[in-house]
Curated annotation (Swiss-Prot):
The reaction(s) this protein catalyses: an omega-(methylsulfanyl)-2-oxoalkanoate + acetyl-CoA + H2O = a 2-(omega-methylsulfanyl)alkylmalate + CoA + H(+)
EC code: 2.3.3.17
Organism: Arabidopsis thaliana
Impact upon substituting residue 485 to L: In strain: cv. Ka-0, cv. Lip-0, cv. No-0, cv. Sei-0, cv. Tsu-0 and cv. Wl-0
This protein's name: Methylthioalkylmalate synthase 2, chloroplastic
Length: 506
């Protein structure tokens, strides 16, 4: 498994870290002032909002690891402080609904263990009412991962199962998750006019009664952590949402979420919806408000951030953004956005995700689902810390922060200062000189000019230049004979990879 976590460009995910740090420094700021809302004993934490919580010894002598913090007491409907955002991961439920992304029970268990290493607050692990196999899988996760308490921090995840507003679904959910230390049920019902008319064939009053009855039934079985999900909330009447949420709160629900199920909302629309519901729903301050966004218009992350900015304090996400149709909000994108910008533009919001586990988790989910991310996928794509433009490479060699706002170590990648530089036709003299130096060649200006000229000629026939190519360029005194090639790696049409032919006069 470890070898499969290797990434391109010499980047390797780190593993096994148990130190938990806040993903962002929880402070508030404005254009003219900076006010800390929490005291910290370690001043090194203030070096940079996006600096890694732990520097690898190979890349830095500075240790930025914060002191281990105890996990706050878990109260289903209360947060440890107003800026804390709970991360609700639904990779194993909504994520698995991605076409072609089904998982075996052992794979789901292994991903659940990895999600625990990531320190998600809640993991929604399945739909027990859908089949006996699913019920048993959820039960296994509840009995194992749901009871594995970290002795140092006190962390243990909430194990959640989803159910329709049907008694048989709710009974199956209880049978599956009751073994966890912190069981939760998410009961969902449709709230948009189009869903109520064509899918449920029920009136608003009937939908409210169905939701309230389901909440009460769940409580009677033993659930004390109950979430109501409003499916297609993004297209629902605002006042009806206020009404059904208010009735659910009276019935002792602990969490409410309004889902942009079809990904239709713009960020400002979704923020306005959250703001309206929080201002006009009786008892809304007695529960946790959650957001759940889909990516049909490519706005799931933006909408999730907008919802948090409007006051939501639970965000529902999946690893790599997998899910129905175009997917869900991506955990890595939302978490790293909060880590880098939450302190500055969202009043100091933060999560407790151990971001150093992001890359390992992403790779595991890709391998098990067969749903591989594109190279330019934010945060976890192969190109995220790779630079080919000469101007960019020059800046990176001088200081990585010139063109990188994230530290690779932040998401669990160990890399050298120059391992993200891809040599190609856009690379400049500085990058070529630095790569040669890394390979052990110290060249004077005349020799460097000669090698760089040969390098530029080679890039006309080959998109990416390897270290072997660079060595051949240096040792050549008479030039290079290179077969005409094409393709990203210099492949000829017959699949043959051309080799540099070097001739020397002795």
């Amino acid at each position: 498994m470890a070898s499969s976590l290797l990434t391109s460009s010499g980047m390797i995910p780190t593993t096994g870290s148990t130190v938990v740090g806040r993903s962002v420094l929880p402070f508030q700021s404005s254009l003219h002032s900076l006010r800390l809302t929490h005291s910290y004993k370690n001043p090194a934490l203030f070096i940079s909002c996006c600096s890694s919580v732990s520097k690898n010894a190979a890349t830095s002598s500075t240790d930025l690891k914060p002191a281990v913090e105890r996990w706050p007491e878990y109260l289903p409907n209360k947060l440890p402080d107003e800026n804390y955002v709970r991360v609700f991961d639904t990779t194993l439920r909504d994520g698995e609904q991605a076409p072609g992304g089904s998982l075996t029970p052992p794979q789901k268990l292994e991903i659940a263990r990895q999600l625990a290493k990531l320190r998600v607050d809640i993991m929604e692990v399945g739909f027990p009412g859908s089949s006996e196999e699913e019920l048993e899988t959820v039960k296994t996760i509840a009995k194992t991962v749901g009871n594995e308490v970290d002795e140092e921090t006190g962390y243990v995840p909430v194990i959640c199962a989803i159910a329709r507003s049907k008694h048989r679904d709710i009974e199956a959910a209880w049978e599956a998750v009751k073994y966890a230390k912190r069981p939760r049920i998410l009961i969902f019902t449709s709230t948009s006019d189009i869903h109520m008319k064509y899918k449920l064939k029920k009136t608003q009053e009937e939908v409210i009664e169905m939701a309230v009855s389901s909440i009460r039934f769940a409580k009677s079985l033993g659930f004390n952590d109950i979430q109501l999900g409003c499916e297609d909330g993004g297209r629902s009447d605002k006042d009806f949402l206020c009404k059904i949420l208010g009735e659910a709160i009276k019935a002792d629900v602990t969490v409410v979420n309004v889902a942009d199920t079809v990904g239709i909302n713009m960020p400002h629309e979704y923020a306005e919806l959250v703001t309206y519901l929080k201002a006009n729903t009786p008892g809304i301050d007695d529960v946790v408000f959650s957001v759940h966004c889909h990516n049909d218009l490519g706005l799931a992350t933006a909408n999730s951030i907008a919802g948090i900015r409007a006051g939501a304090r639970q965000v529902e996400v999946t690893i790599n953004g997998i899910g129905e149709r175009s997917g869900n909000a991506s955990l890595e994108e939302v978490v790293m956005a909060l880590k880098c910008r939450g302190a500055y533009v969202i009043n100091g919001v933060y999560t407790r995700i151990d971001t150093r586990q992001i890359m390992a988790t992403s790779k595991m989910v890709q391998e098990y689902t067969g749903l591989y991310v594109q190279a330019h996928k934010p945060i976890v794509g192969a190109n995220c810390f790779v630079h080919e433009s000469g101007i960019h490479q020059d800046g990176i060699l001088k200081n990585r922060s010139t063109y990188e706002i994230l530290s690779p170590e932040d998401i669990g990648i160990v890399k050298s200062q120059n391992s993200g530089l891809v040599l190609g036709k856009l690379s400049g003299r500085h990058a070529v000189k630095d790569r040669l130096k890394e390979l052990g060649y110290e060249l004077d200006d005349e020799k460097l000019n000669a090698v760089f000229s040969l390098f530029r000629d080679l890039t006309k026939n080959k998109k990416r230049i390897t270290d072997a190519d660079m060595k051949a360029l240096v040792t050549s005194s008479d030039g290079i004979s290179l077969e005409k090639s094409n393709g990203a790696n210099g492949l000829k049409s017959n699949g043959y990879i051309p080799v540099l032919q070097v001739s020397s006069n002795v």
